[in-house]
């Protein structure tokens, strides 16, 4: 067990479906939420709002396989396969009808999970992840998705690539210990292998697009107005197709959960306290 600089976050490992998965959880509460790590970060991305979200909800945050410090399995490196693993994680922790918080790469996985398992998840909070068809991504992320020469990334210094990506955090002062956790998460071949997930977007996002109108799970979408990596049009794309959704565009860049942590946490807490149920009961958009 590793206790971070925030003593309320105690990181541990659990074997789920044969994989070593890093997780942290808060104290027990009546409601449950599963938080999925963004990329190229780790579950520590939720540290700025952990205490607030944990006040009334039992939190389980995980590094998805191949991300953060969790073990990778090549067969899971796509949103659709990862969505099935998300359900396995919920089962492993005994989370009945949990809320899901899934920014960035977790967005498509959570939506696939909701589409494939109606009624299993209470609600989703998503955003800042590629979902639009055709792709609507900033030039750097688009290159990671579409560049045919994966070996060029394999030859590059992964710590430098991740450090460059983290310059997109503009307001939040990232603690050195958290920065090192992010950098060490993708050392060796871990960054280039994690790219395989987003490189399935051209094949998998059209499948997800066709499933969105069938998703009955209520979805809160949070996007950053100044997001240059995954422009807000991705959130608008979801909102137009999901029958029970709410879209909020906040004053932040890509890393809304860190740069806009206060606004993000407020939206999530309002959502969990009853807004999700109102959206679920409302007539489809």
For the regions a protein language model found, what residue spans apply to each?
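Gly/Ala-rich beta-loop-alpha elbow adjacent to hydrolase catalytic centers
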Residues: 102, 106, 110
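Conserved HGGG/HGGXW glycine-rich cap/lid loop of the alpha/beta-hydrolase fold
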Residues: 19-69
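Conserved serine/cysteine hydrolase catalytic core
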Residues: 190-240, 251
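Catalytic active-site module of serine/aspartate enzymes centered on a nucleophile-bearing elbow/loop
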Residues: 244-285
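Conserved alpha/beta-hydrolase catalytic His-Asp/Glu region
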Residues: 135-137, 155-214
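N-terminal cap/lid segment of alpha/beta-hydrolase-fold proteins
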Residues: 2-20
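Flexible "cap/lid" loop of the alpha/beta hydrolase fold
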Residues: 115, 121-153
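Active-site loop/oxyanion-hole signature of alpha/beta-hydrolase fold enzymes
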Residues: 16, 24, 61-102, 266
């Amino acid at each position: 067990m590793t206790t971070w600089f925030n003593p309320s976050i105690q990181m541990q490992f659990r074997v789920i479906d044969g994989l070593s998965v890093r997780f942290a959880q808060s104290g027990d509460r009546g409601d449950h939420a599963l938080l999925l790590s963004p990329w190229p970060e780790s579950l520590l991305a939720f540290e700025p709002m952990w205490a607030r979200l944990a006040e009334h909800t039992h939190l389980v945050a995980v590094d998805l396989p191949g991300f953060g410090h969790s073990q990778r399995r090549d067969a899971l490196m796509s949103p659709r396969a990862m969505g099935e693993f998300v359900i396995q994680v919920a089962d492993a922790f005994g989370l009945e009808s949990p809320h899901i918080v899934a920014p960035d790469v977790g967005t498509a996985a959570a939506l696939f999970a909701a589409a494939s398992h109606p009624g299993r998840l209470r609600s989703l909070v998503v955003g800042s992840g590629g979902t639009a068809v055709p792709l609507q991504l900033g030039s750097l992320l688009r290159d990671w998705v579409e560049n045919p020469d994966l070996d060029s990334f394999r030859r590059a210094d992964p710590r430098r690539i991740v450090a460059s990506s983290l310059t997109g955090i503009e307001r939040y002062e990232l603690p050195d210990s958290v920065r090192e956790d992010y950098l060490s998460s993708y050392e060796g071949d871990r960054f280039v292998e994690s790219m395989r997930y987003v490189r399935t977007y051209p094949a998998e996002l059209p499948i997800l697009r066709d499933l969105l109108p069938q998703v009955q799970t209520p979805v809160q979408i949070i996007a950053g107005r100044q997001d240059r990596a995954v422009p807000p049009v991705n959130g608008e794309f979801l909102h137009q197709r999901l029958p029970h959704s709410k879209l909020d565009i906040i004053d932040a860049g890509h890393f809304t959960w860190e740069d806009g942590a206060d606004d993000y946490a407020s939206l999530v807490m309002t959502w969990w306290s009853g807004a999700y149920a109102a959206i679920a009961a409302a007539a489809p958009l």
